[in-house]
């Protein structure tokens, strides 16, 4: 039950932070490539929602894996695009005012939230494994 609660909570916070970041992308504007948009739509938005739903069902193990993998994917995507590759999507290329302020704050917030989300996914998988070993 706690796994589902924590996983759902982090998925909601993740969606809000990424939604605000996406809004900043639109308003500045900082367009994404088609491949980036596909990744964001599937890995960053859709899969965490599916994971949160599955955590409440008999498929909670799959939900835990999806949560861990989507959060890890989101971390890698954000690290590369916002802090490594110099492009219009890099935090150093966006003014720290107006929508740029929201962009930069949410870029950092997303890393923190996704780190927590990956940690929750890992913790969930470890708990599931321990429960199954205890049942043997």
Task: Name each model-derived stretch.
Residues 12-16, 35-58, 62, 69-76, ...:
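Core segments of alpha-helical transmembrane spans in multipass integral membrane proteins
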Residues 17-25, 69-88:
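C-terminal TM-helix exit segments that contain a strictly Trp-centered aromatic cap at the helix terminus
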Residues 17-37, 88-99:
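Membrane-interface interhelical loops and short amphipathic "cap" helices
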Residues 26-33, 60, 83-90, 125-133:
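Transmembrane helix-loop junctions in multipass membrane proteins, especially transporters and channels
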Residues 95-114:
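Individual transmembrane alpha-helices with interfacial aromatic-anchor signatures
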């Amino acid at each position: 039950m706690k796994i589902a609660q924590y996983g759902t909570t982090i998925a909601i916070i993740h969606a809000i932070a990424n939604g605000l970041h996406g809004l900043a992308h639109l308003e500045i504007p900082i367009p994404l490539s088609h491949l980036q948009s596909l990744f964001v739509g599937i890995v960053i938005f859709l899969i965490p929602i599916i994971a949160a739903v599955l955590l409440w069902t008999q498929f909670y193990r799959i939900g835990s894996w999806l949560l861990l993998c989507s959060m890890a994917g989101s971390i890698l995507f954000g690290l590369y695009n916002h802090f490594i590759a110099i492009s219009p999507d890099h935090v150093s290329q966006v003014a720290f005012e107006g929508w740029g302020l929201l962009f930069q704050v949410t870029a950092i917030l997303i890393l923190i939230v996704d780190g927590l989300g990956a940690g929750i996914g890992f913790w969930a998988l470890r708990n599931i494994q321990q429960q199954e070993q205890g049942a043997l």
